């Protein structure tokens, strides 16, 4: 193997000996790649195939950014997912003095009639995405929207707005332009580093036919090295008899049942080295493809199938955890790459620090109670992160200035709903709109499962349910 590597390396060096714009990358098969695209050998960025039947998957091959590709949408389509997996791509760009992950997102998506379904540089969409502490921003009128932060492996799934839910997905030949932020840095001003028109992506398009689905297969990976109250290590074989785990599963299932989805749950173990590496205080401050969380998600390759992968760890470490605010769950991307197991974005991570907490023996016996029953709290976190993976955004973000693109989820805008003490801070990053401020007709959404803060209330709206049931993960 050492001799073979030397021969391959020599061949790669011969391919680009004089170009200052490329480097040989051992971690990517000794390919000649743009600077910044080569990552350490310990960073796995696998390209995988969809687990869905061939009739749902259009594999379009590997293409350079800037390439416009056609794809076909059948007459009975309910949703479309455009999936880009980096073959060669840098990790970050610097835009207006901010370091951003090099996210993959279609530059444009074109309807069969030639109209534009999505334009990543649409000024009207950019204006609507700006902070709106008065609640005046309305993303629901756009056919589809993009939430950002989808480096390396990205799914762009629609419908995800009221407009696209109402109008559906027209039959015919669509087009989209392969793209990432590095490519856009060559097209717009404001980028000081990371721009490149040489990124290459493996591209697939998933079409999910009507009717909407009603079943979701969920894989819980026990990464945390914890013991149950009897002193036994929590592992997949004893999860089915663990009272707290089963309470968590029942509550999780009830949250999906309200929108007509049956959650079928399985538990899997990981090996001791994975538990030691990822299981305790997993750092999620950064979530690029080479970070620990994203590398953990590649463990889902062990089980082939169309799963919602949820990784259970003892706790999360994040710079966003300050004072009484703790990060307890995080998704790879919104939405996730449904049916693509084993990528750096194939799942969500959940803290089970409170799994065995209860204020009394009766706390976990009745209705869902995330305050007094730790298993219910874990269920809420898991369902919330699954909602993100299926395409749902927060109903209201923590500053009370950004809202989801659905008309039947109430807003809680800062200028109307924050406390008198917080109101002068509206329009900055300082206010945090608590759920208690968002429980009225004019200031709502605090009891929705997708509110930004873990708080009592697991409601899901009709349109949220539609987005979830149209995702290719739900069958």
Residue ranges and their predicted role:
Residues 5-13:
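Hydrophobic helical h-region of N-terminal Sec-dependent signal peptides
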Residues 15-52:
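Bacterial Sec-dependent N-terminal signal peptides
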Residues 48-83, 88-97:
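Non-catalytic, beta-strand-enriched accessory regions in extracellular/secretory proteins
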Residues 63-71, 108-195:
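Noncatalytic accessory or regulatory domains flanking protease catalytic cores in secreted, cell-surface
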Residues 92-118:
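Short, surface-exposed beta-strand/strand-loop-strand elements in extracellular ectodomains
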Residues 184-187, 191-284, 313-317, 326:
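Fold-level signature of zinc-dependent metallopeptidase catalytic domains
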Residues 262-372:
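Active-site-proximal segments of metallohydrolase catalytic domains
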Residues 278, 363-466:
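The catalytic-center signature of Zn2+-dependent metalloproteases
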